[in-house]
């Protein structure tokens, strides 16, 4: 640390949005096939000494393949997991439009109690 309390070297932060396949094409059924490719990226990061942060949405948090990957990364202290909440498809589901999957409603658009519950549900999944 420098005398100003700053790191002596520059800090490099890598974040990866880990979310369902083709999510922005507005699918009704969301798959997580892309989870199987995260190990390859993780190995690349480890080769260069990087510890990425995987920002995780609901679909990934309930994907067995992603969960096995994330548990391994965390167990080895090789990266971190954070929350990436897509409000329109994270429980509890409360429709705000005639097609929330097309409009991709934001968390701030929901009643406060629903926002709080969406955060609680995803936090609980990620902590497990």
Regions found by a protein language model. Give the residues of each.
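Catalytic alpha-helical scaffold of carbohydrate-active enzymes acting on polysaccharides/glycoconjugates
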Residues: 1-128
